[in-house]
Amino acid sequence: MKDLSLRNVSFSYPGGFLAVDDVSIDIKGGENVAIVGQNGAGKTTTVKMINGLLAPTSGSIFMQQNPIGAESKKHISYLPDHTYLNMNERVRDIIRYFSDFYEDFDEKRAYDMLGKLQIDASDRLKTMSKGTKEKVQLILVMSRHADLYILDEPIAGVDPAARDFILNIILSNYEPEASILISTHLIADIENILDEVIFIDHGQIRLTASVDDIRMNNGKSVDALFREVYRC
């Protein structure tokens, strides 16, 4: 994976609202990292900047020392927090579109995951539940041979009983040397797959630490520390 670096990144929306304030992050190849925080903390804005959908108001973002741009997008597979797919399309047609658009898209991997999740490729998205639609979108993202997978709230719309299975699908279907960056507020469900966690609040980094260090130095789980920091 190409190392990712954010340096003193800030972003303000029209009207002057400061959503991200002087954020610096480093993610190395092969790491599974979560940006955690409550709703409105700045998680989605941060991942949109990393994916090149928003341009920082100030600061810089690099992949392997190259500025984020058209070239970096070839190496990033991004799951947004809202679906962007055509609800009238059948799953198999969407897979074909992705295969035509992305050189690194693996159709076999996509169909394997559909089978494991018992999703019929002939079904139209509009006939599916919200959770199943999100599973389809996740399958599309994880079927690329990318360097960085950015997942914005990947299990928020999934039934709690299915979350472990979804996480297993994620971990079983990404490139071994790639990194995964997950934006979430559901810490307990993903803690065991993480190497590092970044706490963000009101657009600022409150803490960056490895999961092992948090457990060793604080004597508690990441989820317990999250609840303490955010008093939830």
Q: For each predicted feature, which ranges?
A:
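ABC-family P-loop ATPase nucleotide-binding domains
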Residues: D81-Q137
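Conserved ABC transporter NBD signature motif
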Residues: G59-S72
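Catalytic Walker B motif of ABC-type/P-loop ATPase nucleotide-binding domains
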Residues: Y149-E153, V158
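Helix-to-loop junction immediately C-terminal to a conserved catalytic motif
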Residues: N51
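The feature captures the beta-strand-to-loop junction immediately N-terminal to the Walker
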Residues: V36-Q38
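Helical segment within the ABC ATPase nucleotide-binding domain
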Residues: R163-P176
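Conserved structural motif at the start of ABC-family nucleotide-binding domains
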Residues: L4-L6, V20
